[in-house]
Amino acid sequence: MQVWTYLDGRWLEGNPAIVGPMSHALWLGSCVFDGARAFEGVAPDLDLHCARAVRSAEVMGLEPQLTAGEILEIAQEGRRRFARDAQLYIRPMFWAEDGFVAPDPSTTRFCLTLNEEPLPQPRGFAVTRSQYTRPLPSSAPTDAKAACLYPNAGRALMEAKRKGFDNAVVLDPLGNVAELASANLWLVKDGVAITPAINGTFLNGI
């Protein structure tokens, strides 16, 4: 799999060593990211994903040193390292290098990774309801695409797979349907697309 990462003004190939055991992001979870797709020569809503990455960093108390527009330019530069029709996953990331419990915002770092990621084939899939729920906004940074939220989603997904299902429906703390463990949830009924109402417990999809 071809992978390119932009870090500190350079493009690095493969899976470079970026954080260490003393990095705040590794041991105290101050990492945010976003994920966009490129396929057939287009990257829909890439600008919106870049903007959300910046907002997520700010929610986590970080100090992003790049604007959404600058991140977009880096992403477009990275796309040119692949075939025009390549199916890519584009992931800008911010994290703190230093701090104890609270991140030190002055140590905020940035990278952007692009990797080949074929789109899944459309097919049916089976879901189950998870015992794990989304957190309240008062207990977790639910308005950011924060890495610290994903272990709970991972538990829900592993639980579903142990039961023989492909994914899990995750509820909010009040019992409302929120999302799937690994994606926003949509269904179509009578020609109308339906998705759960945004209530602050999960991230609004782009």
Model features per residue range: what roles?
Residues 75, 84-93:
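Ordered, amphipathic secondary-structure segments that act as subunit-interaction surfaces
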Residues 82-84, 101-103:
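An exposure/low-complexity boundary signal
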Residues 1-77, 95, 103-206:
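Helix-start/capping segments and mature chain N-termini
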